[in-house]
Amino acid sequence: MAGMALARAWKQMSWFYYQYLLVTALYMLEPWERTVFNSMLVSVVGMALYTGYVFMPQHIMAILHYFEIVQ
C-alpha cells in the first residue's frame, strides 16, 4: 500500500514538473540553461520571501500606528 501511494505521489509530482516545463517553455532549453533559469528563479523567490519576512512586520506596524489601531 505504501509503495502504491509513493508511486502515485511520484507520478503526480512528475505531472506538475511537466506542466511547469510547458508553461514556462523550459522544455526548449538545454539542461544547463534550464539549470541557470531555475537557479535564478529560486534565488529571486528566496530573496522575496526573506525580504517579506524581514520588512513586513515593520510596515504592518507603521500602518497600524498610522490608523491609530495600535498606540
From Swiss-Prot:
Binding partners and assembly: Component of the serine palmitoyltransferase (SPT) complex, which is composed of SPTLC1, SPTLC2 or SPTLC3 and SPTSSA or SPTSSB. The heterodimer consisting of SPTLC1 and SPTLC2/SPTLC3 forms the catalytic core of the enzyme, while SPTSSA or SPTSSB subunits determine substrate specificity. SPT also interacts with ORMDL proteins, especially ORMDL3, which negatively regulate SPT activity in the presence of ceramides. Interacts with MBOAT7; the interaction plays a role in MBOAT7 localization to mitochondria-associated membranes.
Gene that this sequence comes from: Sptssa
Principal subcellular localization: endoplasmic reticulum
Pfam families the UniProt entry points to: SPT_ssu-like
Metabolic or biological pathway, per its Swiss-Prot or TrEMBL entry: Lipid metabolism; sphingolipid metabolism
One annotated GO biological process: ceramide biosynthetic process
UniProt name for this protein: Serine palmitoyltransferase small subunit A
Molecular functions per Gene Ontology: serine C-palmitoyltransferase activity
Keyword Mitochondrion set for record: no
Record family assignment: Belongs to the SPTSS family. SPTSSA subfamily.
